[in-house]
């Protein structure tokens, strides 16, 4: 019996930041550990050789970003279709929003969210027009879209009206497991400084904590300070910190590697995710795995992911966030309860389910 041949394009891993980077890694782990023997998987690149090459990742230099986009376009529209034809591939999985325009293989395109269309003001105008055109151009009648949550599926269904869209929950890194020992009382957020992350609301809530003499609790804001050369939100946050003399209480280590992420989780008393909108929320499942209790905004997607294993505050309201942090600090039983519920909830996000849902598409 002839095996179905599935090609996974991971070229974008060369420049991927935390969210997409983790998605690609987890997809490959899921294939390795739980992929069907009846399917032949072909991976475009050796990820172990790509992992240490960071030249293109989030470069602040426009020329470097342009060079990568040229190489990316050449790969996606010329090299990749040639390889798919040469290797007689049945399905190609593109986890980076974009599929080749011309190829005989059936296409599975992962579009992680609808934020490019929902918040056009958050992206450089010309780049956004180019990238959204590229996304739409690669989608045809042989394409199925995969997205990360039911919330994202609903949003994308408005944009791609005549395309099949399937929601598949990604898995969490198994290394983030049960070692939480918050001796340093960190209140933590891990993620890029982007406008929709609403980190200023978190800093304002934390200021109230300091004003009320909770001086033992340090705020850690880990993640890239700029996104492709644009760092306005970081400077907004930093200016607020400077204005109110909070530098002694807030750490901003910038982009950190996995080993450092594990260490921060292990020392965190609370994980706070104040976003105004997300397609999924990888740090939520990492926190649940790490047994760190979660406070997050009451947006729809977070309720889908966390269910009853998080404490919610009104999105954008720093006073409400302060009240929720205060409750957490003073109620260890509540923290323990939510950690227990989180450990149960996070079992939904496993590698077996992740790849088996993909395989339902091409089986």
Regions found by a protein language model. Name each.
Residues 1-363:
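Carbohydrate transferase catalytic cores enriched for Leloir-type hexosyltransferases
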């Amino acid at each position: 019996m002839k095996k179905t041949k599935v090609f996974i394009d991971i070229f974008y891993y060369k420049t991927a930041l935390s969210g997409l980077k983790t998605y690609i890694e987890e997809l490959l782990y899921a294939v390795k550990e739980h992929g069907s023997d009846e399917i032949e998987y072909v991976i475009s690149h050796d990820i172990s050789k790509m992992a240490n090459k960071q030249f293109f990742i989030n470069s602040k230099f426009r020329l470097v970003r342009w060079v990568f986009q040229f190489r990316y376009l050449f790969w996606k529209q010329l090299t990749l279709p040639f390889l798919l034809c040469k290797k007689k591939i049945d399905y190609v999985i593109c986890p980076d929003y974009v599929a080749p325009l011309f190829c005989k293989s059936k296409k599975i395109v992962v579009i992680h969210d609808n934020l490019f269309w929902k918040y056009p003001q958050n992206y450089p105008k010309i780049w956004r027009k180019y990238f959204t055109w590229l996304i739409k151009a690669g989608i045809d009648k042989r394409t199925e879209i995969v997205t990360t949550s039911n919330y994202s599926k609903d949003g994308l269904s408005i944009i791609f009206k005549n395309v099949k869209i399937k929601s598949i929950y990604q898995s969490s890194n198994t290394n983030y497991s049960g070692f939480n020992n918050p001796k340093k009382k960190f209140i933590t957020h891990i993620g890029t400084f982007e406008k929709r992350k609403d980190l200023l609301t978190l800093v304002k809530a934390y200021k109230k904590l300091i004003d009320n003499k909770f001086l033992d609790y340090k705020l850690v804001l880990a993640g890239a300070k700029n996104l492709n050369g644009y760092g306005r939100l970081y400077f907004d946050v930093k200016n607020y910190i400077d204005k109110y003399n909070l530098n002694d209480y807030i750490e901003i280590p910038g982009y950190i590697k996995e080993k450092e992420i594990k260490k921060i989780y292990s020392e965190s008393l609370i994980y706070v995710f104040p976003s105004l909108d997300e397609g999924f929320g990888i740090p939520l499942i990492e926190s649940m795995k790490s047994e760190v209790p979660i406070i997050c905004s009451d947006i729809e997607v977070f309720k889908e992911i966390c269910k009853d294993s998080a404490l919610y505050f009104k999105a954008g309201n720093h006073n409400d966030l302060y009240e929720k942090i205060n409750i957490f600090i003073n109620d260890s039983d509540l923290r323990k309860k939510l950690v227990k519920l989180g450990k149960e909830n996070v079992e939904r996000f496993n590698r077996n389910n992740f790849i088996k849902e993909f395989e339902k598409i091409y089986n």
